[in-house]
Regions:
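Alpha-helical transmembrane-bundle signature of multi-pass membrane transport and export proteins
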Residues: 1-267
Length: 267
């Protein structure tokens, strides 16, 4: 971790990614659990889980194009500000939506939560793309491989190993608590990214985003290994989501787990 202590800009980027991905990990448990408190309908609960990942499916390539065309620091700051606002909206939802909600109101409530979840996923796609591509501007070429490994590792640790169990403990204390933590984490990440000094990039010729997306799709199709890798990872993620989508009900109704225990199950 020598690089962390000697490179201020990398330290800020690393810390911002850690805090930001902690918020993502907290949301991964908190959103489906909130849905299960609102309704016991598996389809409605699955809608919330589906919405959180839908943005990755439909917006990954457009987000990459946008990252190439626009200032990456501004994209990261904007994405974290948007996520801060959206999670504040989830705090309001957790405080105001009846738990459980009446049958007629549950559908509307789930649609609201799903909409916020989708927008959170959309901001996450843009933010994570920008964070990965800005790294070469923050560290020397000789440190790039090590820095990329460290950045990926902290994202996985915070998002997959710390975030979900922490969310479980917070929900056990108060349902809005994980979303309050999310709001604060994204606010902190915004401040860290704001102070990163990133050299200006050469001017980019702006073209239609959709034209760039089509060109990227053609490029992927013409590179067989990349196409096969993308399809394989897509299928793996889809199968994983089939489990995660309904796992919250399985934990509650079959295993009889508390929210704290469910958080530990997700590690």
């Amino acid at each position: 971790m020598t690089l962390f202590f000697t490179n201020k800009n990398y330290r800020l980027l690393f810390s911002a990614s850690a805090v930001s991905n902690l918020g993502d990990g907290v949301s991964a448990l908190a959103l489906p659990w909130l849905a299960s408190l609102i309704t016991r309908d598996p389809m409605l609960i699955a809608t919330v889980a589906f919405a959180t990942r839908l943005a990755w499916f439909i917006c990954s390539i457009p987000a990459g194009v946008i990252t190439d065309l626009y200032d990456r620091k501004h994209l990261m700051v904007g994405a974290d500000i948007l996520r801060m606002i959206l999670t504040a909206g989830l705090v309001v939802c957790a405080l105001t939506i009846p738990q459980p909600a009446p049958a007629g109101a549950a559908f509307t409530a789930i649609l609201i939560v799903s909409g916020l979840a989708f927008l959170l996923g959309l901001a996450e796609v843009v933010r994570d793309n920008a964070a990965q591509t800005v790294l070469p501007s923050v560290v020397a070429k000789s440190d790039l491989e090590r820095a990329n490994g460290q950045l990926w590792s902290i994202e996985q640790i915070m998002g997959a190993f710390i975030g979900p169990p922490l969310a479980g403990f917070l929900i056990a204390w108060a349902v809005p608590a994980p979303f309050v933590l999310d709001t604060l984490s994204f606010a902190l990440a915004t401040g860290m990214v704001f102070f990163i000094a990133i050299p200006s990039r050469p001017a980019v010729i702006r073209r239609s985003v959709w034209r760039e997306v089509v060109e990227d799709m053609v490029w992927i199709r013409s590179h067989r290994v990349i196409l096969q890798l993308a399809l394989m990872l897509g299928v793996m993620n889809a199968l994983g989501m089939l489990v995660v989508t309904i796992l919250v009900l399985y934990s509650q109704e079959v295993l009889g787990l508390s929210v704290t225990q469910h958080g530990l199950l997700l590690i």
